[in-house]
């Protein structure tokens, strides 16, 4: 919960502010594993966000909770593995809709690559571009429904 999901959270918050609907939304990110609990976003994530004028973003990695499934209309994840994990965690009574953010990728790339082990900032830029494209399409959908 320090690379892709935080990047998507920052982008989505930024887009909501641009569209002047930020106050109507709660945007957050969480992980299902405790590898980075309590840590800030990966430095390369913050560098790429800053390159795109998103500089007011802060976050502390946390685990998704059962409560999240009852307080969130949508829970978006990054790849098939994360979707499977979330589907297994989701309480039967929850009305949250689970999707991969990539389901909204107009270029059809349904999984968003984890750049954490990459040694180039360019991979983070590619993830940013895909997340931005997907967040815009998701917002177009969500604001209509």
Language-model features: where?
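Conserved active-site segments centered on acidic
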Residues: 1-71, 141-145
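Phosphate-binding/catalytic loops
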Residues: 74, 80-145
């Amino acid at each position: 919960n320090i690379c892709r999901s935080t990047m998507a959270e920052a982008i989505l918050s930024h887009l909501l502010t641009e569209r002047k609907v930020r106050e109507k939304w709660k945007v957050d990110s969480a992980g299902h594993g405790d590898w980075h609990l309590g840590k800030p976003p990966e430095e390369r994530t913050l560098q790429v966000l800053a390159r795109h004028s998103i500089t007011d973003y802060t976050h502390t990695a946390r685990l998704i909770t059962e409560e999240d499934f009852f307080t969130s209309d949508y829970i978006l994840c990054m790849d098939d593995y994360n979707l499977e994990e979330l589907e297994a965690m989701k309480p039967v009574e929850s009305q949250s809709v689970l999707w991969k953010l990539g389901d909204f990728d107009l270029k059809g790339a349904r999984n968003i690559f984890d750049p954490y082990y990459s040694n180039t900032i360019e991979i983070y830029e590619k993830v940013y571009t895909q997340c931005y494209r997907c967040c815009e399409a998701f917002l177009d959908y969500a604001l209509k429904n």
